[in-house]
Structures are given as structure tokens and as C-alpha cells.
């Protein structure tokens, strides 16, 4: 006849096995998280950024240089997978939302639709996928969108635009991930992705001059003695100040909100603000996942599940033996 303490021994064994299982899972989880968390080793014309910042569109402060010309802040979004495998094509979806009913001031002062543009900074080694790697479905999403590298030697930084905003509030970038097995300079890990996207014309040209998509101010305090409408559009204001008279030219586009005889302070607005566009920036991350690690993780989890099943079967076997002993 067996010792009746068998049940107590079995209980202690089960507790020990469960503790080991929990510890093993926690260890693997911490390993994965820490390893993946740190990497190893004046219109919507994005190419104007190349003139002002030929080396990189991202300043040391983290700001995309498009913000130097597009002064208004607007929303921008980028959607990418949380993790991708090496040598895989995936979608980076850029969203540039705005009110489709809005009209911007064009260069000649007339109103028109907004254009959109974007610059997408991918991790080193990532690039726009070649056409022969795109599926039929992805080709349809991309359409005729033309993607251009920021520099010839910088395939991971891509610019697009200007594009008609009515059709391209959502732009699909087909991205090809690198393969560390083929390129030893690339490592697995988590990497940053930066987006800069604008809609509408900017307020400042790369030369530093103001565009007509601005609110214009009085340069000095004084009285507006004359308001002359120009034949080509816009206005010429004669401002009488304490030092004499001064001419203020207002280009075609902004609406005048002052009149002759009105006294203004220095810096007071003379026109409305016609700008309906703006720039948005978004930062996110993508993980270049090691497929071998995934295989080992699957095997590890399968082993845990198998051990749990065997433990349950063993428990039932012991319970049957104990029941037989009690009946004996």
C-alpha cells in the first residue's frame, strides 16, 4: 500500500513547476522587450526643404524644416506595422486631413484648392520598394504617386508632392525593409520613423520673403492717409507717421481690414489671415524583427503548453492510483 502523503508531494511538485513556468516566461519577455526596445549597433512643395537643408530635413531639435515656411500647425498621421520581417514590403500610410471645402489664396491672389506634400524619414536601410516587389493590390493603392529620395545617397528619406489634396489626403508609401543577413551594417531592433506633412501654401519662401498667404501688419504706428487699389491686384497704403509718410504694399490675396483715416499701432494687422493650410509632424517607431527569434519563441511557448498538458494527464493518473489505493 502507498504512502498517503503522495497527494501532498504531488501538490508541492505542481507548485514548483508553476513557479518555474512563470519565471521562464518572465525572463523571455524581459529579454525580448529590452532587446527590441534599443536599436543595435511656401507651397506644398517638399523639395523646397532641400534648398534650405540639403543634408537632412530634420534639425537637431527634432523639427522638420518644412515648419520654417509653413508656420501654421496642423494634424498629420502615419500608420505603419508595429514590427516587420527582413526583406518584406509593407505599407506606410500618411494621412493629411483638412476641410475639402476650404480654398487657399494662390500666387495671383485668386482662390483655389490646396496641394499636399510630405517627407518620410525611414530608418537606415529602409527604402521605397521597387515596382516588381509590389502586389497588384498595393500597386492600385499607390497609383501614379512619384516618390523621390531626399538625396541621391539617402534612399531612406523620401519626399512626395505637390499633389492635389482632394485626391491625396491619404498617401500610401510602399516600403521595403532591409535584410541584416545580406547587409551587415543593418541590425535588428526598434527604430524611429519621422513624418513631416503639409497642406496648402507656405507663408515664407526659401529666400526669406513673405508670400501673399500671410496677414500683413503695420510697420509703424500712424494714420492711414490713403488706400489705393492696384490694377494688378492688392493695395498700396500711405501711412503717415511721426517721422513722415511711409508706403505699405499689400499683395493680392489677403483682405484689407483697415480704411483711410484709421489710426493703427505698430504691428497691428492691416489684413485678415488668408492661410487655411499648415504643417504637421508625427514620430513613430518600427521594429525590424528577427525571424529566428520568433521561431524560438513559438517553440518555447509550444513546449510550455505541452508540459502543461502532460502535467494535467499525470495528475489524472495519480488521482486514479490514489483512488484505487483508498478502495483497496
From Swiss-Prot:
**What membrane topology term does the record carry?**
Single-pass membrane protein
Subcellular location(s): the record lists: Cellular thylakoid membrane
**Main localisation:** membrane
Q: Where are its TM segments located?
A: 296-313
- Co-factor binding details: Binds 1 heme group covalently.
**Cofactor field:** heme
Which PROSITE patterns does the UniProt record give?
CYTF (PS51010)
- Pfam families per record: Apocytochr_F_C, Apocytochr_F_N
Q: Which domain of life is it from?
A: Bacteria
By what name is this protein known? Answer: Cytochrome f
- Report the source organism: Synechocystis sp. (strain ATCC 27184 / PCC 6803 / Kazusa)
